[in-house]
Amino acid sequence: MRLLEERILAEGTVLGETILKVDQFLTHQVDYRLMKEIGRVFADQYADLGITKVVTIEASGIAPAVYTAEALEVPMIFAKKHKNITMTEGILTAEVYSFTKQVTSTVSIAGGLLSKEDRVLIIDDFLANGQAAKGLIDIIQQAGAKAVGIGIVIEKSFQAGRQLLEDLGVEVTSLARIKHFDNGTVSFLEADA
């Protein structure tokens, strides 16, 4: 997605050899126009798969996920990183390691929000090692539902996440695919959409 790549080049900041900071439009401040376009592109990409729910993990995946759900006209669910007192029965959980935060979290979705009839599109802001999406696939399968696609806003293609998810049999669509970081600059591979 050329527009996204342009924003990364103009406003993204490379930190070290593996981190891209995109606080200006995705991970802290949200550019709703860009997110709306991202949602439209994901919806177009997966329009023929009978998606019934969009699922993400809080927090930075919520904006692109909600705009994707809007474009598909389906509900959006976000997995919570902290259990609250209203989540009492039938909670679906998975352990997820965050590459950026370097911490393992238990993420959860309340029972009853997913069913065996659901065809789920996973949306996330970044793909690095694939652990967040893998955890969501686990939760979706616990409900008897089917993960039919994974939409990634920014993929770090130099890390193993895509291969892990494709090995699980789920199609991955990334709107920006980073080949590598070199002296603070970003090099891209061809995006999927």
Curated annotation (Swiss-Prot):
Binding site for xanthine: L20, T27, K156
Pathway: Purine metabolism; XMP biosynthesis via salvage pathway; XMP from xanthine: step 1/1
Family annotation (CDD domains): PRTases_typeI (cd06223)
Record keywords, A-Z: Cytoplasm, Glycosyltransferase, Purine salvage, Transferase
Name of the protein described by the UniProt record: Xanthine phosphoribosyltransferase
Catalytic activity: XMP + diphosphate = xanthine + 5-phospho-alpha-D-ribose 1-diphosphate
Positions bound to 5-phospho-alpha-D-ribose 1-diphosphate: A128, N129, G130, Q131, A132
Record localization: Cytoplasm
Originating organism: Streptococcus equi subsp. zooepidemicus (strain H70)
Biological process, per Gene Ontology: purine ribonucleoside salvage; xanthine metabolic process; XMP salvage
Pfam families reported for this sequence: Pribosyltran (PF00156)
Gene that specifies this protein: xpt
Lineage, broadest ranks: Bacteria, Bacillati, Bacillota, Bacilli, Lactobacillales
HAMAP family cross-referenced by the UniProt entry: XPRTase
